[in-house]
Curated annotation (Swiss-Prot):
The lineage of its organism: Eukaryota, Metazoa, Chordata, Craniata, Vertebrata. Citrullinated by PADI4. GO terms for cellular component: condensed nuclear chromosome; endoplasmic reticulum; nucleolus; nucleoplasm; preribosome, large subunit precursor. There is a cross-link at residues 154, 226, 266 (Glycyl lysine isopeptide (Lys-Gly) (interchain with G-Cter in SUMO2)). GO terms for molecular function: 5S rRNA binding; RNA binding. It comes from Homo sapiens. This is Ribosome biogenesis regulatory protein homolog. Involved in ribosomal large subunit assembly. May regulate the localization of the 5S RNP/5S ribonucleoprotein particle to the nucleolus.
Length: 365
């Protein structure tokens, strides 16, 4: 019994080992073509099992896919491995199958004006060497760019032309001419880009003005320019009568969320004291006086306005204005006689007065 049990165990172990080998070992009539760079396996064997599967070949398809995947994994395990950060990885070789591109082919770059002219006239570019012989220095130098041969901007002596101003700086003139050539080339490049993208560039005369700026816009621009320094305008000088701009960007200081228990206790006690106090928060006397003052100011403004309106209406009647009784004279509003309104004495030339014949108007003692 013991001998049979040992033999049965050995047979069972061999059977399990054979099943494991059968799971990872797949036999094909034709070897598969592998592209490990793309993790691709191409099976050239004819699917004979699918013909006998009937209308439901799902089981056969799953078995075929499982076998081909197993062969691909077996090939991956044969690659050299290395350890990277406590992990064993295998580096895939370069892919051999050319996959179709994801995006469409790029469009050809549009021709510039010179390229169009050269194609129309049949002009072909001539290839020139990058190095030329410089007779001045006696060595080979670049044809263009930095340290080029026959660099006229590096000469220490320039002959002044006969028709030029003898006091003109020829070195500065040559440098300015080079800057103009560079700017012209940049303008041509931008024009070519605009022509390629069908855009419109501003004219060479410059940009058109955007219009008259208001006082608020100028002030806002000046304020932005002042705070554009490294110190955010803190050490920027001000004009003698310049006003301090409002909203200069000061940060709000909030109370700490925790830690300052004394200040929090003080604020809470002050709030409770105000709520429990019997004294009203509104000063009735002060508010009443303020209201009466505003009403008096409004009435004074109305009287002043009415008096100015009356003066404008009576200005065309004559030098005396509005009068009652008596012939016109040089006085203002009066009743009877040649003088103004008087309680004693004969009528005179003055205005409202008491006693005497003094030729004056209203007089204070």
């Amino acid at each position: 019994m013991e001998g049979q049990s040992v033999e049965e165990l050995l047979a069972k172990a061999e059977q399990d080992e054979a099943e494991k080998l059968q799971r990872i070992t797949v036999h094909k009539e034709l070897e598969l073509q592998f592209d490990l760079g793309n993790l691709l396996a191409s099976d050239r064997n004819p699917p004979t099992g699918l013909r006998c599967a009937g209308p439901t070949p799902e089981a056969e398809l799953q078995a075929l896919a499982r076998d081909n995947t197993q062969l691909l994994i077996n090939q991956l395990w044969q690659l050299p491995t290395e350890r990277v950060e406590e992990a064993i990885v295998a580096r895939l070789p370069e892919p051999t199958t050319r996959l179709p591109r994801e995006k469409p082919l790029p469009r050809p770059r549009p021709l510039t004006r010179w390229q169009q002219f050269a194609r129309l006239k049949g002009i072909r570019p001539k290839k020139k060497t990058n190095l030329v012989w410089d007779e001045v220095s006696g060595q080979w130098r670049r044809r263009w760019g930095y340290q080029r041969a026959r660099d006229d901007t590096k000469e220490w002596l320039i002959e002044v032309p006969g028709n030029a101003d003898p006091l003109e700086d020829q070195f500065a003139k040559r440098i300015q001419a080079k800057k103009e050539r560079v700017a012209k080339n940049e303008l041509n490049r931008l024009r070519n880009l605009a022509r390629a993208h069908k855009m419109q560039l501003p004219s060479a005369a410059g940009l058109h003005p955007t219009g008259h700026q208001s006082k608020e816009e100028l002030g806002r621009a000046m304020q932005v320019a002042k705070v554009s320094t490294a110190s955010v305008g803190r050490f920027q000088e001000r004009l003698p009568k310049e006003k301090v701009p409002r909203g200069s960007g000061k940060k709000r200081k909030f109370q700490p969320l925790f830690g300052d228990f004394a200040a929090e206790k003080k604020n809470q006690l002050e709030l409770l004291r105000v709520m429990n106090s019997k004294k009203p928060q509104l000063d009735v006397t002060r508010a009443t006086n303020k209201q009466m003052r505003e009403e008096d100011q409004e009435e004074a403004a109305k009287r002043r306005k009415m008096s100015q309106k009356g003066k404008r209406k009576g200005g065309r009647q004559g030098p005396g204005g509005k009068r009652k009784g008596g012939p016109p004279s040089q006085g203002g509003k009066r009743k009877g006689g040649l003088g103004g309104k008087m309680n004693s004495g004969p009528p005179g030339l003055g205005g409202k007065r008491k006693g005497g014949q003094r030729p004056g108007g209203k007089r204070r003692k």
